[in-house]
Amino acid sequence: MSDLARTDVVLIGAGIMSATLGVLLRRLEPNWSITLIERLDAVAAESSGPWNNAGTGHSALCEMNYTPEMPDGSIDITKAVRVNEQFQVTRQFWAYAAENGILTDVRSFLNPVPHVSFVHGSRGVEYLRRRQKALAGNPLFAGTEFIESPDEFARRLPFMAAKRAFSEPVALNWAADGTDVDFGALAKQLIGYCVQNGTTALFGHEVRNLSRQSDGSWTVTMCNRRTGEKRKLNTKFVFVGAGGDTLPVLQKSGIKEVKGFAGFPIGGRFLRAGNPALTASHRAKVYGFPAPGAPPLGALHLDLRFVNGKSWLVFGPYAGWSPKFLKHGQISDLPRSIRPDNLLSVLGVGLTERRLLNYLISQLRLSEPERVSALREFAPSAIDSDWELTIAGQRVQVIRRDERNGGVLEFGTTVIGDADGSIAGLLGGSPGASTAVAIMLDVLQKCFANRYQSWLPTLKEMVPSLGVQLSNEPALFDEVWSWSTKALKLGAA
């Protein structure tokens, strides 16, 4: 074992979260030493990879689970506004990064693609009519359209209109300012900038242990997966952005804040088509309602994607299940994560989430023709041979201790950290990558409270609206939107 080395910051995981935090810290503290540790041999090889996530740029423009109908018939847009506010923070940071040479190829990861909500049936049509009215009063969603004309539907979505009888009413909410995001390509540029500016990147290294020292620092024990060599690294601050592996790594640290937390892995599968004739006839991301019992992230959607310069159509997700916490993980991941302090949490979810379990079982039983049949509800002319099944990444949803039920399953992201701010990690999946900057700013504020005020001037250069709710400041929103649109070379698709 080699001698103990020291670094100011350790980032575990080479995905979008560590990439974002790495750039923030590099700009704030250019002289700090930063070490990135990744168990695989590449950047963004797990959840941030383009084929391992939906790439919708979760800005809450089209996801209907963010705009639920209330018992009185009104539409609650609170969650949609909150998510979009976070996305605006991320968008501004990307614009700053593009202007300052951090992101040198914006189009490789960001492309304009409308975001669309799709329903059929008179009840769904009325829901979208009320949804559009509720959103139109907010500056973040002011451009959202309501469309119910079959002719206009066919003009905008020819692939979905082909062979559609229009015997029942259909409707759309159309947000022209949506984007497709390749978070893998983005993470590569961000980490590339970090490495070019002094960050050490250790690929093929797996963290085996985290131990706190008497001076409050951490010793990180890692193993080179190629040679078996073990190394130790001492650091003042650890961030765990390891996707599904974050919970097991935090458990190794022994911090009391992680006790009671558990993880529930949900896999995803998609149908994919690269036929240029198909991609030319569908230039949008179109979301439907979540199926009964499906988790919020289970709403089916038919998306235009851009990966490595090529356009694709992707439909799904179909839920899968594996005890692995990572796509490249082990089947022992789930059982090894269950400990005395979180056993009741896991059992509680097993008893209370029967609908989810039934949904997962039904998804696992789907045949190939049944998957394409679900696609034909969106695109009646879809041909089986045009589509192939692709396996996406794992999402480990948060199970939190609950006094009443033992445990509750949460579909969101949670930052867990030690009280002294020396270690933090991100649990959960959705909305995830799209809100990375807002989440990492929260990590900075919690973990570097004594420095945060001195960092604010620089942070406000990166995110001009920092600390402001743009939905309450339409003039400022228009200003930063115009600036970021120009910097990111975006416009209506």
From Swiss-Prot:
Q: What would be one Gene Ontology cellular-component term for the protein?
A: plasma membrane
Task: Name its GO BP terms in alphabetical order.
Answer: tricarboxylic acid cycle
Q: Show the catalytic activity.
A: (S)-malate + a quinone = a quinol + oxaloacetate
Name the cofactor(s).
FAD
Q: Show the SUPFAM superfamilies listed in the entry.
A: FAD/NAD(P)-binding domain
Q: What is its EC number?
A: 1.1.5.4
Instruction: List, in alphabetical order, the Gene Ontology terms for molecular function in this entry.
Output: L-malate dehydrogenase (quinone) activity
**Enzyme class, one word?**
oxidoreductase
Which pathway, per its entry? Carbohydrate metabolism; tricarboxylic acid cycle; oxaloacetate from (S)-malate (quinone route): step 1/1
Q: Which InterPro entries match?
A: FAD/NAD-bd_sf (IPR036188), MQO (IPR006231)
Q: What keywords is this UniProt entry annotated with?
A: FAD, Flavoprotein, Oxidoreductase, Tricarboxylic acid cycle
Write out the similarity annotation.
Answer: Belongs to the MQO family.
Q: What is this protein called?
A: Probable malate:quinone oxidoreductase
